[in-house]
From Swiss-Prot:
The gene is trpF. One of its GO terms (biological process) is L-tryptophan biosynthetic process. Disulfide bonds: none annotated. This is N-(5'-phosphoribosyl)anthranilate isomerase. InterPro entries: Aldolase_TIM, PRAI_dom, RibuloseP-bd_barrel, TrpF_fam.
Amino acid sequence: MTKVKICGITTVEDALMAIEAGADALGFVFYDKSPRNIIPERAAEIIGSLPPFIHVVGLFVHAHLDFVNATADRCRLDIVQLHGDESREFCSRVNRRVIKAFRVKDITSLDRMEEYRVAGYLLDAYSPKAFGGTGITFNWDTAVVAKKFGPIILAGGLTPDNVTEAIGHVSPYGVDVSSGVESAPGVKDPAKVREFIKRAKGL
C-alpha cells in the first residue's frame, strides 16, 4: 500500500486530524520563505503530542548543517527532507535518514540522482519561485524512470482528484501532498485530507 505524507503541518489540530485520517507521515517545514514555515519550538510542541508509529519529517532548504541537526534533535525528527541544492556530502553529515528532493523540469533533472545514497528520493515539479508546495504537476513518466535509483516519493500538484491516476501511473513508494489538501496556505482541509488518503490507499 502506498505511503502517504501530509506536509506543511502547522497546528496540533491538523496533525491529529491527518493521523486519524490515515497519514503515515507528517511533514514540518523549517524554511522561513514558505507560507507553511514553523519554528522548531512550535514543531516540537506539536510532535510531542503525537501518538506512536507516526513518522515525523523535517523539510529544510539550503539550511546550515548545524541548524538541521539541532532541529532534528530538538524536534525528535525521524527523517530529514532536503529540498534545496544540498550536496551528497551534506546529506551524509545529517544525523538522520535523508530524503533528497529533486525538482523536475524534464528527464535531465534525474542526472544527479545516482550521486546520492539516501533513504528515499522525492520528485517535485520545478518552479523558479518556490521549493515545493506550488500545486504544479510534472510528467509522471519521469518518475517511472527514476524508480531505478531507489524508493520514490511522488509530489507536485497532487490532489484528491489526481492521486489515484498518479499512483496507477508511477506505483511510487509514497506520495506527498501539501497545497492539494489545503483551504489556505498552511491550513489543512479535513475533507480533502481524508479523501486524498482514502484514494491514495485505495480504501
